[in-house]
């Protein structure tokens, strides 16, 4: 069941179970998307699809229905590909502030790129990455091999940046990094390209400025960059904006209770929870909560790259070691390595 609270080493679940624990690990993944404020009055409107992953929800969309999609990243790409597979051919308008699409992954394998990017300022590292992309092209290699090398060094790169450079990255570069880091399969990219070519998919750099609706449809007012206001009428409005990491501490009862007690707090970058180098939670006034560890993407404000399976698995192993040390379990008493 879902954990609701923890007090004096006792975890209470929604099923009424009470579990005794000397140490608690928050191995949480991503929080659900948050509803945009303009969409809140339409939370129960039949045209609004706030969770495109809900079983069978995309199958309810008629083949010729008009669709608006907020967000242009991975979830949008998967949504459009799924709709297309289900026979949808109606008009789709997808929008985000920058209108950036996730790039296509390489098909097949490639040699690892030897670049190193763990020194210098953000600007210096960015310059080196761009130079290496040019070098790779001269050698007949794609930019993806360079970005894979950057991803593999993501934790050391992030931890080596100053706070100011981390903030600059999040403010100016994060959107561009995300569409190159979180890539889509070539087959999905092909679907998007085909639908753009036949005119059934428009991708816009725009903000949602107003939302109205009647009994069946929703009407979106969009403000494109450097263009006049645009009005889009949609039989369905799908939200694909991704997890609401900035609201993690309020996303479920246990985290809300821990936050209210001052045992955890959101990190300064809005990426998840504040932790120290040992993955221990940091709470109110910067106090460490020694018997509360955080594993996985919620700890990425300190560690950096913690989204891919290899990085998450390595971090989980490190958190397990920290838990055993905290509990005083001797090396000889631990499970043997496989």
Functional labels for PLM-detected ranges:
Residues 1-120, 127-329, 338:
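Flavin (primarily FAD) cofactor-binding/catalytic cores of flavoenzymes
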